[in-house]
Amino acid sequence: QTWPPVEGRPSCKRCGACTRMWPPEANRCVCDDIVPQCHEGCSKCEKVDTRSGKPLYQCQSFEYYNCAA
């Protein structure tokens, strides 16, 4: 099993559901961040309705992230 280096992963302030693998670097997570644009490797990018009317998105697929929390 190989996974991308932590340094090259997109950062995520709030990781939601994650797989439970060992070591921790092997885990993929769903990022709960709402962002202006999904990162390049996101395979399921969903538009989020906001009060401001600005188009914002959330990546809803399990991906490799650099999780802050």
Curated annotation (Swiss-Prot):
Disulfide-bonded cysteines: C12-C31, C18-C29, C38-C45, C42-C59
Name this polypeptide is given: Bowman-Birk type proteinase inhibitor A2
Site label Reactive bond for trypsin, positions: R20, M21
Species, as recorded: Hyacinthus orientalis
Known role: Serine protease inhibitor.
A Pfam family hit: Bowman-Birk_leg
Annotated InterPro entries: Bowman-Birk_prot_inh (IPR035995), Prot_inh_BBI (IPR000877)
Swiss-Prot/TrEMBL keywords: Disulfide bond, Protease inhibitor, Serine protease inhibitor
Ranges that cross the membrane: none
Tissue specificity statement from the Swiss-Prot or TrEMBL entry: Expressed in bulb (at protein level).
Top-level taxon of origin: Eukaryota
Lineage: Eukaryota, Viridiplantae, Streptophyta, Embryophyta, Tracheophyta
